[in-house]
């Protein structure tokens, strides 16, 4: 890919900042905090990748993923699911998120909240690079 990729980050404010820091200069980021804002961006801008966190828009990541994959103009955009900030979810639920995300059309689920910071950054950057290929 020659042009700088445009990455839509769908996350609560703190997680969006963490992702931008983690991903560095991998792309141009557009950060949104609600599903409505995300679809406005998708309607008016070319997006190469969507990265969403579990807690996006009051924990609507899966709902957003299903909506994106059901929208003809956006279904082709790779969608990467993640958990950036540890929360109240039980380990068993978080462990099932990867399967749920992939079943709904995501390319992967990266649980960076469980990883040491250096490994988390490496894993997320690798997942983004792979998703953009």
Where are the regions a protein language model picked out?
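Nucleotide donor/acceptor-binding cores
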Residues: 4-6
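Output/docking surface of receiver
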Residues: 12, 33, 85-127
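Two-component/phosphorelay signaling modules centered on CheY-like receiver
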Residues: 13-33
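Alpha-helical interaction/dimerization surfaces of two-component signaling modules
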Residues: 21-23, 41, 100
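Acidic, metal-coordinating helix/loop segments flanking the phosphotransfer/catalytic sites
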Residues: 33-49, 53
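Conserved phosphotransfer cores of two-component systems
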Residues: 44-45, 69-76, 104
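Conserved phosphotransfer microenvironments
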Residues: 51-72, 79, 83-85, 89-95
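CheY-like receiver
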Residues: 129-133
């Amino acid at each position: 890919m020659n042009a700088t990729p445009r990455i839509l980050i769908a996350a609560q404010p703190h997680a969006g900042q963490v992702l931008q820091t983690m991903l560095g200069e991998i792309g141009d980021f557009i950060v949104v905090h609600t599903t409505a804002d995300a679809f406005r961006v998708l309607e008016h801008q070319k997006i190469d990748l969507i990265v969403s966190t579990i807690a996006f828009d009051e924990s609507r990541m899966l709902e957003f993923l299903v909506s994106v994959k059901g929208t003809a103009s956006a279904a082709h955009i790779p969608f990467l699911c993640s958990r950036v900030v540890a929360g109240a979810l039980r380990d068993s639920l978080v462990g099932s998120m990867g399967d749920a995300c992939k079943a709904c059309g995501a390319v992967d689920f990266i649980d960076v909240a469980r990883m040491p910071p250096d490994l988390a950054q490496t894993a997320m950057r690798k997942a983004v690079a792979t998703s953009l290929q």
